[in-house]
Amino acid sequence: MGQQGYKVIEGLPSQMPYQVYYQEGVYAVRDADGRERPLKYYAVIPTQGNPMGSRGNDSLRFPTVVYCQGSGWHQQWLWHHFAHHVRLAERGFVVVSVEVRPYGEMVFPGEVDDFLDAVQFVHEHAAELRVDTTRIAFWGDSSGAHTALMAAYTAEAALMPRCVVDWYGPADLELLSTQRSTMELHGPESPAGRLLGGIELADHLDLARKASPVGYVAPDATIPPTLIMHGGADPFLPFEQSVSLYERLRDANKEVEFYRMEGDGHGGGAFDNVAVLDIVEEFLRRQLG
């Protein structure tokens, strides 16, 4: 102990190589019955400079995650997983969380179109956002995972991601038409029913298939590697939704990893554990390089 009463700490290496800074804005404007409807984004960006001042080396480019926040296709609150995004940015990833229109303002595939427009924006503003456009992943949770999967499995080559992360997303709306949970899953007022225009899924199975990520998986399809994580005790979206996607990917010989979060529900719990973020990070690093 020093003479002034202080204790000395020395020799500790930095365990947080990047500071981060925050940026938000509008990536597109839609027409909504004659009024302008901005679609927003925020980005959490690594920097080796001072986030309150200089951004450091402007030539740096980072692997990037474009994130779609789940909401049951209602209006999103983009910052629900903000802590996850900051932690990932501290580890050297740009994270861009993007708004898509809710049902009532669009019908499927409007939200997928919005997401892909956001990805195009990220490509066009790569220098500003510090994005390495050759190393982009998609990630979403719940309805946002459905959007991320649909975008990943249907994107043109220029916008196709290197991989996609699915946290407890609906993947098979035809199967959903037969399932039960603690919430309405498939009627005209259900989230999926309203996404498709206020329908009963069982009465419109062709449309349900068209809106299902599993329907785009085939041996000859270009499908990016997929990480699936789903709570084994999900009270809202049956775990079997992720089983259906996993089996379709496996049978088509596509690269897939699947984790059952035993005892966990629809987000929260283990999904807020740093060990789970470590699994996601390891997958992203392996796929993005």
What are the functions of these language-model segments?
Residues M1-G289:
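Alpha/beta-hydrolase superfamily serine-hydrolase fold, recognizing
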